[in-house]
C-alpha cells in the first residue's frame, strides 16, 4: 500500500502536491513545453496570434483534469491570467521583410524557409507552392471586372497587404453601379488572409475612437458595402493609412495605449469616399480609386464562383507576391493608370467645386496683376453656384479651399487688398472680377426686374 502511494506521488506533476495545484509552477511547466508569448494584449505562438483563447483553455483543462480538485474553471482562468504575466515580453515588432505561411516563411527576395520554428505575429493559412498552377479562374474574373490597365494596381495592393507595413500609404476603393461582382474579391481574400483580415466599416472607423483598436494585429480591413455618407472626420482614417509605427489606441473602459497598426483599408462601393469638411489634398491623395466595368446584360452569374476561386488560393498567393515584389522594386509607389488618376481628381473636384469655379469663364479671370477681396470673391462664387445648380460652400470653407489652391493657380492670399469702400481687407492677388453680383440693392435678389402690368406695352 505504501509502495502504491509512493509510486502515485512520483508520477504526479511537480505543480500538484496531491491536494492543490500550484498555479505558478504550472505556468512554468506549461511555458517550458510550449512556445508562447504575451504582448500587446494577445498571446502569440508559431502559428501567429491566438484569436480565441478557448483552445488554450481546453489544453490546460486536459492537463488539470487528472487532478481531483474543485472549481477547475476558476483555476484555468487564474492560470491564463498568470500566464499573461509569466509569458510577457516588452515588445514584439512586426517583420516587414517576410511572409509567414502555413508551411514556412517566404522572404521578399523570393527565398523560402520550411517549418515554423519561431513565434510570429501573423501566419497566413496558405501553403507556399512554387509550382502552383496559374489562377486562371481568378484572372478571368478580374479581366471581366476591371479594366486591364487597373489590374496591376489591384495586384500590387493585395501583395502590399501580405506584409505588416504601411510604407505605401494608400487605401483602395473599388466602385461600380452594383451587380458587377466586386464583393467576390473580399470572399477570396478571406481565404488568403484568414484571421488576419477583418470585415469592418470605414464610416465606423472615422467616427468611433474605439474602432482603431479593433484593427490591431490585422493586415487587411475590408468594407464590403461602404456607406455613401461623407465622413465628418477623416483624421482616424488618415492615421491608419499612414501609420508607420505604434499609434495611440483606446478600448472602451480602458486606458489608451501604444500599439502596432499595420491594417490596410479596402472598400467596395457604389460611390466615392468623400469628406464633409476635409478638402485637403492629403485625404484624396491617399486613395486608389478603381472603376469596375459595367455588367454585361447577357452575363449569367455563377453562385459558386467564390468557392471555385478559393481553390486557386495557392496560385493567387504567387500572383499577389509578384505584385508585392514589383511594388517594393518601385519603392512602394503604386502603378496607376490614367483612369485611376482621373478618378481621384474627379472625386476631389466633386467634393470641392472651388477648382471648377477658378477655371470657369464669365465670372472671374486669373490675372497676375489683379486683385479681389475675399467678400467679393465669395459673392461671385455664390452666383456661379446658383446659376449652375451647385451647393455653395460656407464662407470659411470656401476661403480655406481657395487658400489651399493658391499654389496650383499662382494666387496669393494677403490682407493688403483695398475694397470699394477704401478699406484694407483680406483677399487674393491674381484674380480679377468679371461678374458683379452686388450691383443690385439686395445680393440675393433675382437678376430679373418685376414690371407692373400697367407699365407694360
Language-model-detected regions and their locations in the chain:
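Replication-associated primase and helicase/ATPase modules
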Residues: 1-34, 44, 49-52, 128-144, ...
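Intein modules and their embedded homing endonuclease domains
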Residues: 2-128, 260, 285, 373, ...
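A short, contiguous, amphipathic alpha-helix enriched in charged residues
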Residues: 20-25, 190-195, 230-247, 399-400
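P-loop NTPase catalytic core of nucleic-acid-dependent motor ATPases
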Residues: 31-56, 99-100, 105-219, 288-291, ...
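Positively charged interface segments
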Residues: 77, 193-195, 200-209, 231, ...
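Conserved AAA+/SF3 P-loop NTPase catalytic/coupling segment centered on the Walker-B
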Residues: 219-242, 257, 276-283
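Phosphate-handling catalytic cores of nucleic-acid transaction enzymes
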Residues: 310-352
Amino acid at each position: 500500500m505504501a509502495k502504491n502511494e509512493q509510486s502515485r506521488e512520483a508520477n504526479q506533476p511537480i505543480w500538484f502536491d496531491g491536494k492543490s495545484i500550484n498555479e505558478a509552477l504550472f505556468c512554468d511547466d506549461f511555458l517550458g513545453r510550449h512556445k508562447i508569448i504575451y504582448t500587446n494584449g494577445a498571446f502569440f505562438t508559431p502559428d501567429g496570434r491566438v484569436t480565441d483563447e478557448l483552445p488554450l483553455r481546453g489544453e490546460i483543462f486536459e492537463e488539470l483534469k487528472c487532478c481531483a480538485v474543485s472549481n477547475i474553471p476558476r483555476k484555468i482562468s487564474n492560470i491564463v491570467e498568470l500566464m499573461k504575466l509569466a509569458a510577457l515580453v516588452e515588445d514584439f515588432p512586426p517583420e516587414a521583410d517576410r511572409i509567414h505561411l502555413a508551411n514556412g516563411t517566404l522572404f521578399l527576395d523570393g527565398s523560402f524557409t520550411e517549418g515554423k520554428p519561431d513565434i510570429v505575429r501573423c501566419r497566413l493559412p496558405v501553403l507556399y507552392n512554387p509550382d502552383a498552377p496559374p489562377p486562371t479562374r481568378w484572372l478571368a474574373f478580374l479581366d471581366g471586372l476591371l479594366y486591364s490597365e487597373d489590374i496591376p494596381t489591384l495586384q500590387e495592393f493585395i501583395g502590399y497587404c501580405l506584409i505588416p507595413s504601411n510604407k505605401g500609404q494608400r487605401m483602395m476603393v473599388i466602385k461600380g453601379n452594383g451587380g458587377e461582382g466586386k464583393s467576390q474579391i473580399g470572399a477570396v481574400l478571406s481565404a488568403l488572409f484568414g484571421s488576419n483580415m477583418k470585415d469592418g466599416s470605414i464610416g465606423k472607423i472615422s467616427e468611433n475612437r474605439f474602432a482603431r483598436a479593433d484593427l490591431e494585429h490585422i493586415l487587411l480591413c475590408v468594407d464590403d458595402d461602404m456607406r455613401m455618407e461623407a465622413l465628418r472626420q477623416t483624421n482616424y482614417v488618415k492615421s491608419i493609412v499612414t501609420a508607420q509605427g505604434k499609434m495611440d489606441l483606446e478600448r472602451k473602459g480602458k486606458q489608451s495605449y501604444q500599439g502596432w497598426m499595420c491594417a490596410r483599408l479596402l472598400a467596395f462601393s457604389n460611390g466615392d469616399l468623400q469628406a464633409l469638411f476635409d478638402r485637403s489634398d492629403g485625404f484624396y491623395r491617399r486613395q486608389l480609386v478603381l472603376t469596375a466595368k459595367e455588367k454585361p446584360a447577357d452575363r449569367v452569374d455563377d453562385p459558386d464562383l467564390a468557392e471555385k476561386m478559393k481553390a486557386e488560393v495557392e496560385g493567387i498567393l504567387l500572383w499577389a507576391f509578384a505584385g508585392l515584389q514589383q511594388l517594393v522594386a518601385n519603392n512602394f509607389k503604386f502603378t496607376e493608370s490614367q483612369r485611376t488618376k482621373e478618378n481621384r481628381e474627379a472625386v476631389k473636384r466633386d467634393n470641392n467645386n472651388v477648382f471648377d469655379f477658378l477655371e470657369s469663364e464669365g465670372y472671374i479671370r486669373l490675372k497676375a496683376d489683379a486683385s479681389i477681396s475675399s467678400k467679393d470673391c465669395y459673392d461671385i462664387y455664390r452666383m456661379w453656384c446658383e446659376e449652375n445648380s451647385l451647393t455653395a460652400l460656407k464662407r470659411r470653407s470656401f476661403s480655406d479651399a481657395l487658400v489651399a489652391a493658391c499654389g496650383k493657380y499662382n494666387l496669393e492670399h494677403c490682407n493688403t487688398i483695398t475694397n470699394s469702400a477704401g478699406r484694407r481687407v483680406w483677399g487674393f492677388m491674381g484674380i480679377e472680377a468679371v461678374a458683379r453680383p452686388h450691383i443690385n440693392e439686395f445680393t440675393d435678389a433675382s437678376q430679373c426686374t418685376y414690371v407692373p402690368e400697367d407699365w407694360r406695352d
